[in-house]
């Protein structure tokens, strides 16, 4: 499956359905399933309960449904850059996110591939912090 690394806390926000637009400096023609992985950078983010957010691992499978230039209205979105020039909004379907076991993965700056057999959905009622 195609995968994309996203910095924390944004990777968790996408996995939890709280962030439905990923902002990137380049557009994508990709539509459909995309594995969101937490990048190895941006260490030190914690939940309100003090649990460290995971890094360098799989987080969720989402559907990319659109890619468009960023608009002024997007500035209010979680994680949005304030200068919209040259930024793209990768629109994710908020109803299709599926949290997966947070297995370690070698992330890359651009798209990379992860073997489908390694992607295991988490049982209902569990979250990444349960692993």
List where the protein language model places each region.
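Structured alpha/beta reader/binder surfaces that contact nucleic acids or chromatin modification marks
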Residues: 1-131
């Amino acid at each position: 499956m195609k995968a994309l690394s996203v910095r924390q806390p944004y990777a968790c926000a996408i996995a939890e359905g709280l962030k439905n637009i990923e902002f990137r400096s380049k557009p994508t023609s990709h539509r459909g399933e995309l594995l969101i992985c937490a990048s190895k950078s941006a260490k030190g983010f914690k939940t309100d309960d003090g649990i460290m957010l995971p890094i360098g691992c799989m987080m969720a499978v989402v559907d990319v449904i659109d890619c468009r230039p960023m608009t002024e209205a997007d500035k209010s979105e979680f994680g949005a850059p304030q200068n919209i020039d040259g930024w793209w909004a990768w629109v994710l379907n908020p109803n299709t996110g599926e949290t997966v076991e947070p297995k370690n993965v070698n992330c890359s700056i651009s798209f990379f591939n992860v073997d489908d057999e390694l992607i295991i959905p988490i049982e209902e009622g569990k979250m990444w912090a349960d692993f």
